């Protein structure tokens, strides 16, 4: 699952943060940077889910207000061996979704109205399974930590520009401060994006195993990618640091599978799922209970049944 690579990248991000602190204030600056990072992450640990859900205007739904969606999430969570997460809906025309929460016991899955109106039952099952995979892998906490440290690096680098421009034993000087202000956030962004892309591939594979059908997720990714290019997500545009949370990059400026992309290219993700489907003969045994005969995805598929 690429956990070793993720750990190395996270360690590099922390080291970069301490390095910026060292350039500003020497050994004491590095120590202070570490303390600030710990305090910031502690705050994010307890509050990040509420903050991001509020940012996107998500409202919680229950079996009474969204019975089909709630039942689908409950069944997939059971198949994944997870506690039932809270379910939220965002009033946004762009089809997309994300998961948040500090652990599986305090997790939430949020989907847009555009997603519920655009996907078939099977495709929506694939998307929900992908988000549950992030919860199962504790990616929601990991991405909160990386986003928090990356943001702190940017703020610290700007602080160094104004207060680290002297030429004493500790200050990097004006040129060094300028370089730090530009390169440190850039380096943090590269590490953050590399971690995000690593976790997306892992969540795709686990999500396919949870729902049992890799091609459900592959079909959903293709449909969401096509629509996301045409329908802007204004909340995400105002808060681009949250783009990595979504199943498909919600921002208007997208790249290929390279250092500057928040996600792997959708084409590569679909190809990986197609290979997984080919290896398994089209279906996978997730290891959970068999599907409920009354499950939405055992009925005839139709467009947009969740609106």
UniProtKB/Swiss-Prot annotation:
Keywords assigned: Cell inner membrane, Cell membrane, Hydrolase, Membrane, Metal-binding, Metalloprotease, Protease, Transmembrane, Transmembrane helix, Zinc
Catalytic residues identified in the record: 131
Ranges for region Disordered: 277-307
Residues reported to bind Zn(2+): 130, 134, 200
Membrane-crossing residue ranges in chain numbering: 7-27, 28-48, 145-165, 171-191
One GO cellular component term: plasma membrane
EC code: 3.4.24.-
Gene3D superfamilies (UniProt xref): Metalloproteases ('zincins'), catalytic domain (3.30.2010.10)
A biological process term (GO) from this entry: proteolysis
Molecular function terms from GO: metalloendopeptidase activity; zinc ion binding
Cofactor requirements of the protein: Zn(2+)
Cited PANTHER family: PROTEASE HTPX
Descriptive protein name: Protease HtpX homolog
Species this chain originates from: Nitrobacter winogradskyi (strain ATCC 25391 / DSM 10237 / CIP 104748 / NCIMB 11846 / Nb-255)
Gene name, Swiss-Prot/TrEMBL: htpX
